[in-house]
Amino acid sequence: MVERDVVLAKIAVIDRCIHRIQHVRGAPHGLTPIDIEDITVLNLTRAAQAAIDLATHVVSTEAYGLPADVAESFSLLGQHGVIDAELAARLRKMVGFRNIAVHSYQTIDPNIVDHIVESRLGDLRALAAAVAARFGV
């Protein structure tokens, strides 16, 4: 059984990071473009990690199987009807972004960051809402 406090804490991190991204990108603050990019990437990374933590918590506590890697946790959520398969696939890609950002595998493409901010923050919210609804949190 999922732990309510863990789920709520991870959802709060996701919400806070999304709010911070929208705030820093939505109004002039006297920040340089590199500062805005750094704040955005940091908060995307934190939100992605919170989503990973949320998924792995559910997979573990609900005994959905043993994922081969953290990205597979989203697939398992899809297979068990917590989220749909399309959302699971998009969240798996978010893991790839997080890995690049955290491990500096390569330079982060600002166009990818913009795409995530403009088109994929809703995926993180959808995961949070689906988990909360499924488990009555």
Where are these regions (language model features)?
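Solvent-exposed interaction patches of small proteins and small membrane subunits
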Residues: 1-137
